[in-house]
Amino acid sequence: MSIMDHSPTTGVVTVIVILIAIAALGALILGCWCYLRLQRISQSEDEESIVGDGETKEPFLLVQYSAKGPCVERKAKLMTPNGPEVHG
């Protein structure tokens, strides 16, 4: 004689509680899956859209390249006076 033998509906209640727990776990997993899927979609859209405050990624890359550009031009200007044309 165990404690659970006193009521015939105890097994039914246990099954219902287990089903509710499985449904809640399934809803949690489904919610996380949908959330991660939406994050991936929004990340791919963010790469093409505005990053913030009216700035996009393309001008940021252009600023990096333009920052390298004057350094190359300065090196070219420094090398030109030292070339054979000045001493020749």
Curated annotation (Swiss-Prot):
Main location: mitochondrion
Gene Ontology molecular function: any one: metal ion binding
Top-rank taxon, per record: Eukaryota
Ranges in the topological domain labelled Mitochondrial intermembrane: 1-10
PTM sites of type Phosphoserine: S49
A Pfam match: SNN_transmemb
Membrane-traversing stretches: 11-31
Cell location: Mitochondrion outer membrane
Membrane topology designation: Single-pass membrane protein
CC terms in the record's Gene Ontology section: cytoplasm; membrane; mitochondrial outer membrane
Record-linked InterPro entries: SNN_cytoplasm, SNN_linker, SNN_transmemb, Stannin, Stannin_sf
Annotated GO biological process: response to toxic substance
Intrachain disulfide bonds: none
Keyword tags: Membrane, Mitochondrion, Mitochondrion outer membrane, Phosphoprotein, Transmembrane, Transmembrane helix
Record's subunit section: Monomer.
Function statement: Plays a role in the toxic effects of organotins. Plays a role in endosomal maturation.
Record family assignment: Belongs to the stannin family.
Protein name: Stannin
Gene (UniProt): SNN
